[in-house]
Amino acid sequence: MRILYLDPFSGISGDMFLGLLVDLGVDPEKIKSRLEKLNVEFEFVVKKENKKGVTATKVDVVFPGKEHHEDHIVSDHDHHHHHGRHLSEIVEVLSRLEDPLKEKAIRMFETLAEAESKIHGLSKEKVHFHEVGAMDAVIEIAGAVAGLELLGVEKVFCGTVNTGSGFVMTEHGRYPVPAPATAELLKGIPIYVDQKVRTELVTPTGAVILKSLVDEFRTPILRVEKVGYGAGTMDLEIPNVLRGYLGYIEPSERTGDVLIETNVDDMSPQLFGHLMERLFEAGAKDVFFTPIYMKKNRPAVKVSVLCHESKKDEILKLLFKESTSIGARVFYPEKVEATRTVKTVKTEYGEIPVKIASFDSEIVNISPEYEACKKIAQEKGIPLKEVYRAVCKSVSEVRDDV
């Protein structure tokens, strides 16, 4: 499994995260291409900067004739003369993108608005974003999602986050670090307050990236492929960079997952579909039903739920509420999995991504990405199996490159 491990020893911001992705090999023009449907005129200005002896990639989002503004993207709600945007306007802009990029970016901006609304005592719709700051965040948030996809990352891990300390000036006044909305976004995320760094190290955009895109806040056992650095804007006593490790989880790495099972023999079949939906909504990684026969030859269904250990109690509570079960078994399985990478192959129908599974340094399986093949089949009006056939013809070149 290809993963990205973030080491935010000097905090995180939207531009630092973009800089890290580019430093790890993502082409900024490809990110920009993914965002073309926004119909927003902007440029990525990419340069190398030296931060206390560490060479890092700096990425700025530049709008023609407008000043960069990312640190605080919410306007003073008591001064309506500000030019700005509300959440509905931001969602309208993001809705021009294609799924899943659109869905993830909108969800992230809604998370940002929810934090601001809670702090300022407003509804989400009344949160007022700076005109330029909001568009900065739109590009950085959508670019973060697109960049991870281009990098082929399947899971994001993160270490403890340095927030900095002291106070910061905003349009609302002098706020402690982290600022209230940022602190709200950081709930549930491991942080530490570095009293030696008297400035704000985590911006709201950086916090929402952590909140929305990080799968687990822990240090995994991984084989490192690349190390990258995204540059921040400040010159501090420590390098103002976001460090990231791109690599693979070792097959022996424990997943931290639990398997919950229960046998149900007295529930209406109509309720099982609803149960599955609710379990996925609650954070289950997988849910499956197995027909079984219990004592007295009574037909029943074994409900199996795979989830992260942190979700165990929530899943159990939901299982008891939404089913007739009054007991469940909890297992801690050790998962062994092949290393997975994503490559692109050229076919007569265009470029198509394929998943490559390797175990013990040997390729054991190559499979086309279903959604990409389905989209091409629909666009060209051809059978899906014809697209699969074209991919299989081109698979030999992938084997040679791995």
Swiss-Prot record:
<protein>
    <recommendedName>
        <fullName>Pyridinium-3,5-bisthiocarboxylic acid mononucleotide nickel insertion protein</fullName>
        <ecNumber>4.99.1.12</ecNumber>
    </recommendedName>
</protein>
<dbReference type="GO" id="GO:0016829">
    <property type="term" value="F:lyase activity"/>
</dbReference>
<keyword id="KW-0533">Nickel</keyword>
<comment type="similarity">
    <text>Belongs to the LarC family.</text>
</comment>
<keyword id="KW-0456">Lyase</keyword>
<dbReference type="GO" id="GO:0051604">
    <property type="term" value="P:protein maturation"/>
</dbReference>
<dbReference type="InterPro" id="IPR002822">
    <property type="entry name" value="Ni_insertion"/>
</dbReference>
<dbReference type="GO" id="GO:0016151">
    <property type="term" value="F:nickel cation binding"/>
</dbReference>
<comment type="function">
    <text>Involved in the biosynthesis of a nickel-pincer cofactor ((SCS)Ni(II) pincer complex). Binds Ni(2+), and functions in nickel delivery to pyridinium-3,5-bisthiocarboxylic acid mononucleotide (P2TMN), to form the mature cofactor. Is thus probably required for the activation of nickel-pincer cofactor-dependent enzymes.</text>
</comment>
<dbReference type="Pfam" id="PF01969">
    <property type="entry name" value="Ni_insertion"/>
</dbReference>
